[in-house]
């Protein structure tokens, strides 16, 4: 999962699109034989914690935010969630705890980054 995060960050450069982040994460994770949680995604960061664009960890053509061009000054949370088995998750009765449906292990790494003229800057 950490390597998937690093690959996503490498693709978070001026002129690329959200698609470039999402697709690079998905290609790496699936090539390693793992699956990607689809219900939870990264996001923009601004005056509120969760703003557009959404930063999915997969390249679903139906996600319009994939076409958003990355511009200098944007802050993004990139946060791949990778499962050893099925990609499906469930929320416990406490309304907060999330588990894989099949009981296999899952991992999540996250960084907040700033898109700069030269390379992404990790803020966390």
What are these regions, as identified by a protein language model?
Residues 1-124:
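Active-site neighborhoods and metal-handling regions in enzymes and metal-associated proteins
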